[in-house]
Structures are given as C-alpha cells and as structure tokens.
Amino acid sequence: MKLGFVSAILPEQTLAEVVGFAADTGFDCVELMCWPKGKAERRYAGVTHVDVTDFSQTEADEILQCVSDGGITISGLGYYPNPLTPNATEAAIYSEHLKNLILAAERLSVDIVNTFIGRDQTRTIDENWERFKQVWKPLIQFAADHGIRIGIENCPMFFTEDEWPAGQNLAYCPEVWERMFEEIPSPNFGLNFDPSHFIWLQMDYLKPLVTFADRIFHVHAKDVRLDRAKLDEVGILATPLSYHTPKLPGLGDVNWGSFFSVLSDTGYEGAVCVEVEDRAYEETLEMRQRSLQQSHIFLRQFTG
C-alpha cells in the first residue's frame, strides 16, 4: 500500500510546494485536486493544483518531472462536484470538467479519477436513477476508452441544512453500489472508499472491504467522532454535523488496526490518502501541515 494525502487541505501552496512537503514528510503519493479555477463552492472545494482545462502534454511532462524529482507519485486526480444537480447548466459544466480530468489523467499516466456520482437531494434514489444512467453511462465509457478508472467516494454529502433532506451523492451505501455496478458493469467503475462516513451512518465499515474488494480503487483515510449523547438528544433525522465531528485518523471512532487488517487481507495494494477535515487543525498552514505529519506517523505503522 501507498500512503498519501488529499491536496485540498493545502490550497495556498503550489504544486511544487505540495510535492516537496509530501516528500519531506515521507508520504508516497498525493491525490491532486483539479477544480476549475474560481470561487470555491464549499469547504475543501475550489482547489486547483492541476489545471486540466486545455491541458497539454507539455504541462503533463512538467508535472511528472516535478513529482519524479520529489520521489513521489500521483495517486489520482480529484474533483468532487454534483453531476446530478437539477441545475442543467451546472450539471453540464461538471460533466465536461470530469472529461477534462480523464484526458489529463491519461496524459499523466495516472489511471484513477476520483469524484461523486451526485444527486438531486429533493428526490428519491429511484427518481434520480434515470439521470444517473444518462450522465454516468457515457462518462464511464469515456473513461474506459481512455484507460482511466473512476473512483466514486461514498460520502452522502449530507451534513448541513442546505443539503437536506437526502444529501448530494447517491453512492453512499452498499445497496446503491450493487445497483450502480449492475447498471454499469464496467471494470473501470469503482469506489474511493472512506470508512469514516459509515461511522456516523452507523454501518459496518469493514464488510464492504471484502464484498467490494474488486471495486475499491482508492481509499481516503479520515476519522470521525460520534457524539452519542448529542445523538440521543437530536436523533438521526438531525443534520449529521450536529452529532458527529470529522477528526484526524486515530482521533475518532474508526478502528484503524482492524481496517488495515481486513484491507490487507483483500490484497489491496493501492493508495490510502489522508483527508484532513478536522477544524481543530485548520487555522493556519502550519497546523494543517502538522495534521498531515501526525497522520503520517499514525498510519505508517499500518502501511509499512
């Protein structure tokens, strides 16, 4: 396994600075954020360490030289919008930018693009399904044609009132994954698995490692702390951030020893990338860098 981090937590740093920090800390790889340049739509979005618009082979070669000089690799390219938003104009922009990521990944010889399926949060899964097929069948075929695998993160994208009532990502649970992969059985369609979401959803985060072993292309290492006393007060219908807190790996409720024990048993040899969303470490660049250093020390015991 390779240990890396998601570059979104270092938005003010250049690609060269991110690579240098990763190398100095001892990371093996980085998932590079590729949002379109412009105002961020939400926290951790809007970060552009690789601008994939009109991306040339010359640009790709420069990036590859940069990461090679640092002695690391690119685990994947990341972009996490809502391709199934009911706003047709926005949805078209998101899908087109995903195609740009796929083409950039091909030029970079990076075989994974990580993203969300998306969702119209006001509609049921069944009501979203036709849009899912319309948007994602051609996207997965486009990725396959260019030798790229798509890793869908299992975050429900339901944290606050503006994402009520159902969140903005269909692909949050195994039942939906089964249905997705039956609908689009392409070997280029899989998961970017984050166990932390299953903690606050109160689901088994180990079983999917086995059940979907052949579909797990990439892993995010994030932790959460569930506030049971608060959950007892507000119940599961409250907005989820009212009863759980994102934390660094090792500071929440994920049993990382068990997680890596099962993950390694499946034969997984891909990237495990730290995703920092812990507000206790976000105030300054130095604190965010320290959060990555701390996470590296903790997780390296499991990845070797």
Locate predicted features.
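Short, well-ordered beta-to-alpha junction loops that form the rim of enzyme active sites
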Residues: Y79, F116-G118, E153-C155, P195, ...
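Short secondary-structure transition/capping segments
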Residues: E41-A45, N87-T89, I125-E127, E163-P165, ...
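N-terminal small/glycine-rich loop or linker at the start of catalytic domains
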Residues: M1-G4, S75-T85, A238-T239
